[in-house]
């Protein structure tokens, strides 16, 4: 791969939860060392890998640039890694920015004007791009040109500028937040799914080899099933368990060492951490299992409503612990059982009976 330019890219907001799928402060360099360098090294997402291989090989055989590519899915599944792999597979240079960094059309115009033929432009969080920049992007994606407005008011003129043929790779955790015109301009869209435990075991084995960690097979399985289906979380937990093994044991990670370490870091057997359990406990013990509004629930655990709704709730819903209903959040029978409590009679996997009547 040629030059790598991350002009305009922004760091993730700090998040000190070990089970957060977002990058934590200072984690970028370590995360980069574990990134796969080719589609052959990329673990998981078999359908996406196959589809991407066809798109890229077809473009190389034709001697042209591939269609613009949209990668969607939850954070931590490898969208940035795939963008880097796409550039590497095409033997192209990669330019990296993010939606929030493109506040004005001029910001995008400056970046597009520096592209050379065949470059890959990666825009992370593309759903957060400002509207003026997005509208300029339409023309660049379709016709490889942009119209730059010079001057203001009635005397303003539009100057067309040619843009070198390039491939845009957009990444989003909220594909529904993309406008229709932007979404329609991507020739290929790939949705990335959460990983199965067996796939995460392979991710952990590869990472352990790169980091020189002695990881037992059963220990890898233990970490994998607590990683919330997310490779980034799996790699983070691996490093935390390594710390424990080196400080309190002989450095070899066995299943017992992994369990003991994850207990210290408050990550339980399903991957729930202290905040997740606090939300469930408040929902059940303070509100009888619900229904209760997210704002009220957030006050009960001393967090902002957005933290509960965007950080905790997605995994709790996916794990079958919380149900969203028109009347509020409801604890399922699994949530009661997970906290060691007996569900009330009549409660189901979707919460209390009668909520949808």
Curated annotation (Swiss-Prot):
<keyword id="KW-0378">Hydrolase</keyword>
<feature type="region of interest" description="Small ATPAse domain (RuvB-S)">
    <location>
        <begin position="196"/>
        <end position="266"/>
    </location>
</feature>
<keyword id="KW-0547">Nucleotide-binding</keyword>
<dbReference type="InterPro" id="IPR008824">
    <property type="entry name" value="RuvB-like_N"/>
</dbReference>
<feature type="binding site">
    <location>
        <position position="232"/>
    </location>
    <ligand>
        <name>ATP</name>
    </ligand>
</feature>
<dbReference type="InterPro" id="IPR004605">
    <property type="entry name" value="DNA_helicase_Holl-junc_RuvB"/>
</dbReference>
<feature type="binding site">
    <location>
        <position position="34"/>
    </location>
    <ligand>
        <name>ATP</name>
    </ligand>
</feature>
<keyword id="KW-0963">Cytoplasm</keyword>
<dbReference type="GO" id="GO:0005737">
    <property type="term" value="C:cytoplasm"/>
</dbReference>
<dbReference type="GO" id="GO:0009378">
    <property type="term" value="F:four-way junction helicase activity"/>
</dbReference>
<feature type="binding site">
    <location>
        <position position="81"/>
    </location>
    <ligand>
        <name>ATP</name>
    </ligand>
</feature>
<dbReference type="GO" id="GO:0006310">
    <property type="term" value="P:DNA recombination"/>
</dbReference>
<feature type="binding site">
    <location>
        <begin position="142"/>
        <end position="144"/>
    </location>
    <ligand>
        <name>ATP</name>
    </ligand>
</feature>
<feature type="region of interest" description="Disordered">
    <location>
        <begin position="1"/>
        <end position="27"/>
    </location>
</feature>
<dbReference type="GO" id="GO:0000400">
    <property type="term" value="F:four-way junction DNA binding"/>
</dbReference>
<dbReference type="GO" id="GO:0016887">
    <property type="term" value="F:ATP hydrolysis activity"/>
</dbReference>
<feature type="binding site">
    <location>
        <position position="80"/>
    </location>
    <ligand>
        <name>ATP</name>
    </ligand>
</feature>
<feature type="binding site">
    <location>
        <position position="185"/>
    </location>
    <ligand>
        <name>ATP</name>
    </ligand>
</feature>
<dbReference type="Pfam" id="PF17864">
    <property type="entry name" value="AAA_lid_4"/>
</dbReference>
<keyword id="KW-0233">DNA recombination</keyword>
<keyword id="KW-0067">ATP-binding</keyword>
<feature type="binding site">
    <location>
        <position position="324"/>
    </location>
    <ligand>
        <name>DNA</name>
    </ligand>
</feature>
<dbReference type="Pfam" id="PF05496">
    <property type="entry name" value="RuvB_N"/>
</dbReference>
<comment type="similarity">
    <text>Belongs to the RuvB family.</text>
</comment>
<protein>
    <recommendedName>
        <fullName>Holliday junction branch migration complex subunit RuvB</fullName>
        <ecNumber>3.6.4.-</ecNumber>
    </recommendedName>
</protein>
<dbReference type="InterPro" id="IPR027417">
    <property type="entry name" value="P-loop_NTPase"/>
</dbReference>
<dbReference type="InterPro" id="IPR041445">
    <property type="entry name" value="AAA_lid_4"/>
</dbReference>
<dbReference type="InterPro" id="IPR036388">
    <property type="entry name" value="WH-like_DNA-bd_sf"/>
</dbReference>
<dbReference type="InterPro" id="IPR003593">
    <property type="entry name" value="AAA+_ATPase"/>
</dbReference>
<dbReference type="Pfam" id="PF05491">
    <property type="entry name" value="RuvB_C"/>
</dbReference>
<feature type="binding site">
    <location>
        <position position="76"/>
    </location>
    <ligand>
        <name>ATP</name>
    </ligand>
</feature>
<dbReference type="InterPro" id="IPR036390">
    <property type="entry name" value="WH_DNA-bd_sf"/>
</dbReference>
<comment type="subunit">
    <text>Homohexamer. Forms an RuvA(8)-RuvB(12)-Holliday junction (HJ) complex. HJ DNA is sandwiched between 2 RuvA tetramers; dsDNA enters through RuvA and exits via RuvB. An RuvB hexamer assembles on each DNA strand where it exits the tetramer. Each RuvB hexamer is contacted by two RuvA subunits (via domain III) on 2 adjacent RuvB subunits; this complex drives branch migration. In the full resolvosome a probable DNA-RuvA(4)-RuvB(12)-RuvC(2) complex forms which resolves the HJ.</text>
</comment>
<keyword id="KW-0234">DNA repair</keyword>
<feature type="binding site">
    <location>
        <position position="35"/>
    </location>
    <ligand>
        <name>ATP</name>
    </ligand>
</feature>
<comment type="function">
    <text>The RuvA-RuvB-RuvC complex processes Holliday junction (HJ) DNA during genetic recombination and DNA repair, while the RuvA-RuvB complex plays an important role in the rescue of blocked DNA replication forks via replication fork reversal (RFR). RuvA specifically binds to HJ cruciform DNA, conferring on it an open structure. The RuvB hexamer acts as an ATP-dependent pump, pulling dsDNA into and through the RuvAB complex. RuvB forms 2 homohexamers on either side of HJ DNA bound by 1 or 2 RuvA tetramers; 4 subunits per hexamer contact DNA at a time.</text>
</comment>
<feature type="binding site">
    <location>
        <position position="80"/>
    </location>
    <ligand>
        <name>Mg(2+)</name>
    </ligand>
</feature>
<feature type="binding site">
    <location>
        <position position="329"/>
    </location>
    <ligand>
        <name>DNA</name>
    </ligand>
</feature>
<dbReference type="InterPro" id="IPR008823">
    <property type="entry name" value="RuvB_C"/>
</dbReference>
<dbReference type="GO" id="GO:0006281">
    <property type="term" value="P:DNA repair"/>
</dbReference>
<feature type="binding site">
    <location>
        <position position="195"/>
    </location>
    <ligand>
        <name>ATP</name>
    </ligand>
</feature>
<feature type="binding site">
    <location>
        <position position="79"/>
    </location>
    <ligand>
        <name>ATP</name>
    </ligand>
</feature>
């Amino acid at each position: 791969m040629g030059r790598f330019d991350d002009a305009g890219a922004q760091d993730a907001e700090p998040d000190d939860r070990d089970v957060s799928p977002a990058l934590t402060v200072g984690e970028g360099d370590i995360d980069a060392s574990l990134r796969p360098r080719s589609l052959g090294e990329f673990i998981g997402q078999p359908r996406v890998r196959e589809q991407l291989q066809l798109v890229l090989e077809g473009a190389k055989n034709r001697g042209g640039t591939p269609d613009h590519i949209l990668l969607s899915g939850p954070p931590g599944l490898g969208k940035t890694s795939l963008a880097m792999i796409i550039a590497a597979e095409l033997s192209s240079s990669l330019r990296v920015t993010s939606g929030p960094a493109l506040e004005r059309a001029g910001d995008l115009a400056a970046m597009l004007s520096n592209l050379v033929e065949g470059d890959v432009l990666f825009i992370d969080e593309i759903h957060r791009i400002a509207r003026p920049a997005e509208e300029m992007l339409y023309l660049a994606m379709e016709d490889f040109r942009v119209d730059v407005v010079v001057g203001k008011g009635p005397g303003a003129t539009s100057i067309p500028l040619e843009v070198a043929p390039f491939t845009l790779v957009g990444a989003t955790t909220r594909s529904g937040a993309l406008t229709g015109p932007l979404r329609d301009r991507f020739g290929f869209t790939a949705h990335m799914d959460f990983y199965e435990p067996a796939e995460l075991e392979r991710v952990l084995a590869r990472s352990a080899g790169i980091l020189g960690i002695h990881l037992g097979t059963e220990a890898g399985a233990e970490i994998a099933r607590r990683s919330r289906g997310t490779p980034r979380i799996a790699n983070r937990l691996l490093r935390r368990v390594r710390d424990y093994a080196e400080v309190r044991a002989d450095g070899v990670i066995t299943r017992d060492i992994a369990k003991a370490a994850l207990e210290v870091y408050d990550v339980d057997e399903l991957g729930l951490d202290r905040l997740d359990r606090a939300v469930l406990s408040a929902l059940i013990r303070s509100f009888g299992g619900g229904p209760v509004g997210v704002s009220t629930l957030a006050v009960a655990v001393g967090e902002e409503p957005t933290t509960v709704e965007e950080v905790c709730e997605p995994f709790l819903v996916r794990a079958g612990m919380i149900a969203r209903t028109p009347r509020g959040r409801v604890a399922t029978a699994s949530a009661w059982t997970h906290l060691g409590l007996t569900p009330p009679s009549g409660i189901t996997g979707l919460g209390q009976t009668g909520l949808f009547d």
